[in-house]
Amino acid sequence: MPLINMPDFAGALLDDFAARGAARVDTPVIQPAEPFLDMAGEDLRRRIFLTESETGESLCLRPEFTIPVCLSHIENATGTPKRYAYLGEVFRQRREGGNEFYQAGIEDLGEPATARADARAINDAIGILHKLLPGRPLTVMLGDQAVFEAVVKTLGLPSGWQRRLIQAFGDSTHLDQLLKTLASPQTAHGLDPAVEALLSSGDEAGLIAHLDRTMEDTGYSTNASRSPREIAARLKEKLALAETRLDGAALLLLREFLSLELPLSEATAALAGFADAAGLSLGAALDGFEARIAALADLGVDLSRITYRAAFGRPLDYYTGLVFEVALSGETAVLAGGGRFDRLLTLLGAKHTIPAVGFSLWLDRIELARAR
């Protein structure tokens, strides 16, 4: 038995999911914690309720549905494309509202026409909310991590810095801190003077030998930790990242991109103009962006209600492209949110790459909005 009452519109919502070709899937409330800790992002990791089995396995109360639905799909070895629907309780530590609440949504797995699948996810989220909140105008905020990644990859940064920036996408405070760091070279702090001297001289063999001796003297086993060679490689990367500086023109370029915010109907032209003026090629990322807008138009979605913000992301690490959120016009509470997560199923154990997109509905917030 659930500890809180299911929303009174749950039955109608499940019927709507079925009409949209999404089959309901149930997943256990108790989940293995590792996938969420590894892939869900720092914001969600802080909110997870963790526990442990008698055998020492790390477990958690289900904090969201995307990872459990994907694990269920892999476990049952069903074919694709497949549309799944879910409705149930999730558990998160929250500053406002209860720690236990209902979410529902659709996960679209294996649809090769990614632009069409993206558009369908946005259209479904809007359509469902219009049914649940008739006559209430909605706004949509849209971002695209693939476009951001394409811009970052043109800057000539080391791969470690590229990863840092991409992982910070959507977290404006963290991203701004990284850009400030890139504006002026830093020094690597906390290094042993001997290690620092060997790194500065470029004597890799000497560094490995020094680390090997240190590990032997302190009793560290290479079987239980990284080898001296692996540690040396990480230290070299740490030093390179600390000393990396992004020149003023490139930094200005990145900040200019992140400042873009405009109606979605104008976004393709704005991105193409930005790329041309900067001498960049955004390639497949821009092509996919344009194809998604065309697919939205084909579905009759009102593009004037959608805003593209280049810096907009969602606080989950598994997103790879489209990200979006839907709210009532003039309000900040997110009623629906989702995006594309093409790498997630492979990371969870799928044998082949499975393109995927989906969205979740915050039923407690929708219930409050219906009551007003």
UniProtKB/Swiss-Prot annotation:
Pathway: Amino-acid biosynthesis; L-histidine biosynthesis; L-histidine from 5-phospho-alpha-D-ribose 1-diphosphate: step 1/9. Heteromultimer composed of HisG and HisZ subunits. One of its GO terms (molecular function) is histidine-tRNA ligase activity. Keywords: Amino-acid biosynthesis, Cytoplasm, Histidine biosynthesis. Signal peptide: none annotated. This is ATP phosphoribosyltransferase regulatory subunit. PROSITE patterns: AA_TRNA_LIGASE_II. InterPro entries: aa-tRNA-synth_II (IPR006195), aa-tRNA-synth_II/BPL/LPL (IPR045864), HisRS-like_core (IPR041715), HisRS/HisZ (IPR004516), HisZ (IPR004517). The gene is hisZ. This function is generally fulfilled by the C-terminal part of HisG, which is missing in some bacteria such as this one. Gene3D superfamilies: Bira Bifunctional Protein, Domain 2. Its main location: cytoplasm. GO terms for biological process: histidyl-tRNA aminoacylation; L-histidine biosynthetic process. It comes from Allorhizobium ampelinum (strain ATCC BAA-846 / DSM 112012 / S4) (Agrobacterium vitis (strain S4)).
